[in-house]
Amino acid sequence: MPARSWLLFTVLLSTACVRHTPLASVENPNVITEDEIRDNGAGTIYEVIAQLRPEYLRDRGPAALTGGARDVAIVFLNTQEYGPLSILNQVAASDISEVRYYSGIDAVIKFGRAYGNGVIQLISRTH
């Protein structure tokens, strides 16, 4: 019995000493939040993404899942296809509340097989 009590004490002590971080404060690398957009101070959403998550903008090579015409992520505004990456230069950062990035496989599952190189989804403030 003393060994069992000692084990319980050790487990309780070790978990009490661990720093617990609330899930909400853990940064999601696939999301740029409204606070991040506002705090960045950039004029366009392209500038925000280029500064905070430049990997969203990189060339991904031929899309193996789609037979490949598209080699970069496609931009969606809310739930509709909006255009190529260059359209991000025309979107004011202040009009966007969140940016979500979907990798190729995640984009195919959510948006369809034409999006094998990923999707950058902009969530507008008016959505």
Provide a role label for each language-model segment.
Residues M1-L7:
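Bacterial N-terminal signal peptides that target proteins for export
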Residues L13-A16:
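C-terminal motif of bacterial Sec signal peptides marking the signal peptidase cleavage site
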Residues V18-H20:
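Bacterial signal peptide processing site
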Residues E27, N40, G68-V72, S94-I96, ...:
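Extracytoplasmic
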Residues E27-Y46, F76-L85, S124:
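Short, polar/charged loop or turn motifs at beta-strand boundaries
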Residues E34-T66:
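Post-signal-peptide N-terminal segment of Sec-exported extracytoplasmic proteins
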Residues L65-I105:
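Periplasmic plug
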Residues I96-H127:
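A beta-strand signature from Gram-negative outer-membrane beta-barrel systems
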